[in-house]
Amino acid sequence: MFNKSKLVNILGINFLSITNKQFVDQLKTDSNLHLNRFVVTANPEIVLAARKDKEYANIINSADYVVADGIGIIKGAKILKKPLPERVTGYDTMLSLLSWANQEHKKIYFLGAKPEVAQTLSSKIKETYPRIHIAGINDGYFKDDSYIVETIKNSNPDIIFVALGFPKQEFFINEHRHISDSIWMGVGGSFDVLAGYSKRAPIFWQKHHLEWFYRLLQEPQRIIRMMALPKYMLLIYRKKFLKK
């Protein structure tokens, strides 16, 4: 665990000031020690959702690690003169952990996405990471989570990736993390990308901080969700000038 001096508060959410490598190394250490960890990779949408819902905000801030997944968080931190080292995306962190889990023969449970995505994901994991022990794969379209809870409890995975989208995935983890001393991590739409149902922005777009625009071009229906960014930036500047 990191001390509080490593935390940077952005609009009420405490972000860990850390690099990608440092974070992945910490998660590996935690996993090897069988520590129970709740990971949130937060973007501006999550920050805004937390401002509207006190219970959700409390859940986010009760997580062991909240990292900056989203260039808006990095820019906001810089504007507030509380710079964070770099983005720590859920997708990249998941890939790093999958590679490590494959080397170390770790057990992983996958929860979330549509049924067809979950099915394709199972084949993809077996093909790309053959030494990973799949503790279970379940899509996110369930009415009763008792079967999922029992499966996790009985298999005791090293890592549990939850792709239910926010805020559902954070509520799920918060409610059930006590059943297994694992790394519990919300990963949003990462299963869709890993299974090949969605495309991630090419490196050029990522390096120029335009991943959000690429996703908008791929999925125009995201325009309503994208409106969160200007609202978020308005709050950032408001906080900056009120401090003066």
Stretches with model-predicted labels:
Residues 43-47, 164-169, 190:
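Short glycine-rich anion-binding loops that position phosphate/pyrophosphate groups of nucleotides
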Residues 152, 156-161, 165-166:
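Proline-aspartate-enriched helix->loop->beta-strand connector
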Residues 73-75, 168-169, 190-195:
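Short gly/pro/ser/thr-enriched loop/turn and capping motifs at secondary-structure boundaries
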Residues 74-151, 155:
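Conserved beta-alpha
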Residues 36, 106, 180-182:
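A short helix->loop->beta-strand "cap" motif at the edges of active sites that frequently abuts
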